[in-house]
Amino acid sequence: LPLFAEYIQHGYYPFSKDTTFEIELNQVINQTMENDIPQYANMNVSTGRKLKQLLMIIAKSVPFKPVMQKLADIIGVSRNYLSDYLLYIEKAGMIAQVRDDTGGIRGLGKVEKIYLDNTNLIYALGRENSNIGNMRETFFYNQMRVKQDVISSKISDFQIGERTFEIGGKNKGQQQIAKAQEGYIVKDDIETGYGNIIPLWNFGMNY
């Protein structure tokens, strides 16, 4: 568990053991938002700055439940472009969008929540908002979406196929998954699982 806590803060990136890790991570963020994405998407400099502003707004309120028009007004862009901007930021590995199961024209459901891509980014960008609940959900989604189709759950945190997952601490109860067809409680701060209870750290071992 101490090693897991260490990973949460600075274990995701290959340069995590560097003494200048925080400086390097912030350089990666700035390079990605201000140069890489604008060049890839053929954006001008001012639009690149708006992307950075958008990321900071998300970082301060994760898990972020987007109201697209309000968000577009804040950063001064057309609502029509906002979904594309978010998709660029997601593809660049800065955020992760959790969608519902409604599908749509692009084959993507409605975005229900936006997380930072991994827990290290929470410490780099939103340290003052690094609440433990958000940390747990971010880690679970970061690890499971690699090989699974993870969507938002109507009764809990996440849905993978017929399985429902509620994320919490060691005292988390079963109430929210009581009506789930196949429900699991994912608990932080425990080393071993039992019944339908699975330790959070276990999800870091699935690929």
Protein language model regions, located:
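Catalytic cores of nucleic-acid endonucleases
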Residues: 153-155, 168-207
